[in-house]
Swiss-Prot record:
SUPFAM superfamilies: Enolase C-terminal domain-like, Enolase N-terminal domain-like. Its EC number is 4.2.1.11. It comes from Mesomycoplasma hyopneumoniae (strain 232). Belongs to the enolase family. This is Enolase. The active site is at 209 (proton donor), 359 (proton acceptor). GO terms for molecular function: magnesium ion binding; phosphopyruvate hydratase activity. Its cofactor is Mg(2+). One of its GO terms (cellular component) is cell surface. Catalyzes the reversible conversion of 2-phosphoglycerate (2-PG) into phosphoenolpyruvate (PEP). It is essential for the degradation of carbohydrates via glycolysis.
Amino acid sequence: MSKITKVFAREILDSRGNPTIQVDVYTLAGGFGSAIVPSGASTGSREALELRDTNTKYADNWYGQKGVMTAVDNVNNIIAPEIIGLCCKNQRLIDQKMIELDGTPNKEKLGANAILGVSLAVAKAAANELRMPLFRYLGGTNPTLMPVPMLNVINGGEHASNTLDFQEFMIMPLGFRTFKEALQAANKVFHNLAKLLKKSGFETQVGDEGGFAPNFNSHEQALDFLVDAIKESGFNPGFKGENAVAIAIDAAASEFYNGQKYVFKKLKAASLSKNQADLDEKFEFSSEELLNYYGQLLAKYPIISIEDGFAESDWQGFIAFNQKYGNNHQIVGDDLTVTNVEILKKAINLKAINSILIKLNQIGTLSETLDAIHLAQKSGMTAVISHRSGESEDTTIADLAVAVSSGQIKTGSLSRTDRIAKYNRLLVIEEYLNSYAKADYIGREVFYNLKK
């Protein structure tokens, strides 16, 4: 048994300049693991609680009382004494002990950020002690599937101060032989998009996730630019065949739902400020009207995937969406399911989605995350491994995507080091796999539950 000998947490900064927690774990046999916890901007109401220093003795340390020293103290003073001496390879036991120590449904006592930091650092320490890559430790020797990247090249919603209500407009390079070739294709599209934006007089500043954040007149205008950038790069806007590059959307509809209607608040405000009537013809939608709007977009553009097309409380909207379009398009639940097994079971029973987004900090432990992934895959769903808008140089999700053969990873655009770090890690993993056997990149086939 390889015992944990030391656990130490500290407060550092994430990609938005906000405090987050980093945890180091040491083992008796010389293993070491360190993990940095991400943070989201648009969050589901049922997510595990990220503990901040509001109304504590640390409240005034950082802007907006966003410090995490309370979570740091919880690791160093409460969690550490309980897990020191345990075997670092017994991940589930350690995760369960932390869940029991917390004792709340959403980890609000110790903080999901405190618990997750320890959970991930333990796994990394075990892998390090065994002198193997994290993806091998988590997945064994079988996984060889490299994920198709979902690159958020146009940001909107809560991730950017622009006019777009949809949060992410992504490209998915499908028609390529390797992950590296796919990334090279995405690189060309990204830079050609910048060129086209500049040529049309748009700014090319980037949002939280490294994508451009122009003030477009409509969501359709954003999609038109994506199609043009794909063509300008010499690729095929579509799902199938050589050089195919598809589009994916994260609508994050909970952010523009007022409890009764879906309102494109940002586009509407832009229209009013410009006194223009020729922008999006409609800014307010019932659930049924929004479904029809998505149908128009799916008919016009090569969109393969839509995430959070409806608000997290609008189960009927999701069910209707999946029933109508789920045979040919990936219908992803994020805020709807928050990487929670019990909520995922409901979504499966209701046939509300055919894919789940996986975010480690939504649930708060590695074990629970793996449970959600395995349940989704067992039920015929795809599982998309995802970053958060507040990220760091931590590359855990890259290893996780390969370990579980998810086939898809969503980790931002091709700018900002916090996003690039994950892509660089995947390039290294692909090289590692090719040195032993052959890394697989199967493009369109990752959508194994869609009609061919």
